[in-house]
Regions:
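Conserved N-terminal/central alpha/beta ligand/cofactor-binding core
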Residues: 38-42, 46-90, 95-103, 129, ...
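Glycine-rich loop(s) and the adjacent beta-strand/alpha-helix scaffold that form part
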Residues: 295-335
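N-terminal Rossmann-like FAD-binding beta1-loop-alpha1 element of flavoenzymes
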Residues: 108-132
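Phosphate-coordination loops involved in phosphoryl transfer and adenosine-cofactor binding
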Residues: 105-107, 254, 293
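Low-acidity, Ser/Thr- and Arg-rich intrinsically disordered low-complexity segments
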Residues: 4-19, 25, 31-34, 41
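Short hydrophobic core segments
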Residues: 109-111, 291-300
Length: 335
């Protein structure tokens, strides 16, 4: 029952403060106990699975830490990436102001060799498009470095907590960070996207009937998330590179595009190439190359480094400046 006003007035502020402090102390004590139980169970699991010793050390103010040997951490997160073949070679040389510049030709230039860029390149290559992937560093992007532990997927309708594309799209844009049309397109495309990764060999967990194991994640009422563990994103990059190698993809590593070139045809601006710096280029003092193309896919990463608080590796830079200089409009940056 609610307290009456005269009852509240009889409570001493000092007594109330002491009661709150006591309650807070009890809650914190119970929380620490729960954390210790979880950590001890983690240690037992690690000892049993990897036959190594993980120690529980106590810090100040009951902040406990698990001291896990680096060998265990490496085994949990390390992924052996494939050896890249098909390094692109220049077709010809042109002279510009007395400087010899190598020329590379392709139909579509993909900037970035992370999960997004490689997936775009693989799908284009499968459809017979002449693709060239240019990357500042192979296996150095956010996908290959962060190793995120879960990916969201669409699940077919079931009797229990069924799912559909509309509700999935609403969940994607429920935080107000993206528009519904983009969310709906991603929801519809996620079926083929996940199926493609499985076809390439992504080792997602399955139950005894062959269904992918799922769990609920943020803004997820149907249980759409699945995971390969702490190496999920790295494994995605691995299988995509393996597929790219199988398809004979041309890749240009150590390459940074600095300008997108475009011209106007019948009043419509179109891309015709890009100027890039190639660290391995020794035929001119600037390391400058020209890539001739008719389409460009910019997959150099999002604006994570623009924010003070970010979970992305600090050395992973995006290429939004290229898009802005080329006159493109940016949207859904906070997706």
């Amino acid at each position: 029952m609610p307290l009456r006003s005269e009852t509240v007035s009889k409570v001493s502020p000092t007594a109330l403060r002491k009661s709150l402090i006591t309650l807070k102390s009890k809650v914190e004590t119970e929380s620490v106990k729960c954390i210790l139980v979880v950590k001890k169970r983690c240690i037992l699991y690690l000892q049993e699975k990897y036959s190594c010793i993980a120690k529980l050390t106590m810090g100040d103010e009951d902040n406990s830490l698990i001291s896990i040997p680096q060998a265990i951490l490496d085994r949990l997160t390390r992924v052996d990436m494939p050896k890249v073949r098909g390094i692109a070679k220049s077709e010809e040389m042109i002279e510009v102001a007395g400087v010899s510049i190598p020329v590379y030709e392709c139909e579509t230039l993909v900037l970035g060799s992370g999960a997004a860029g490689m997936r775009a390149a693989v799908e284009l290559k499968r459809r017979g498009v002449d693709v060239l992937v240019a990357s500042t560093g192979l296996f150095a992007g956010t996908s290959a470095c962060s190793g995120s532990d879960k990916q969201t997927l669409y699940t077919a309708s079931t009797d229990y907590k069924g799912d559909n594309f509309v509700s999935y799209a609403k969940g994607l844009c429920s935080g107000g960070a993206m528009n519904f049309s983009t969310a709906y397109i991603e929801a519809v495309g996620s079926v083929d996207a996940l199926g493609g990764l499985l076809y390439m060999g992504l080792p997602l967990p399955h139950d005894e009937n062959g269904a992918i194991l799922r769990y609920q994640t943020d803004h997820d009422e149907a249980g759409r998330a699945t995971s390969c563990g702490p190496r999920t994103s790295k494994l995605m990059v691995k299988v995509l590179f393996e597929e790219a190698i199988t398809l004979g993809m041309r890749i240009l590593p150590s390459c940074s595009v600095i300008r997108i070139l475009k011209h106007s045809i019948d009043g419509t601006e179109q891309v015709y190439g890009a100027i890039a710096l190639h660290r391995d280029e020794e035929r001119n003092a600037y390391g400058m190359i020209f890539i001739e193309c008719t389409h460009i896919v910019i997959a150099t990463g999002g604006p994570g480094e623009l924010y003070r608080d970010s979970v992305y590796p600090r050395h992973c830079h995006g290429g939004l400046g290229l898009a802005l200089e080329a006159g493109l409009e940016l949207c859904n940056l906070t997706e």
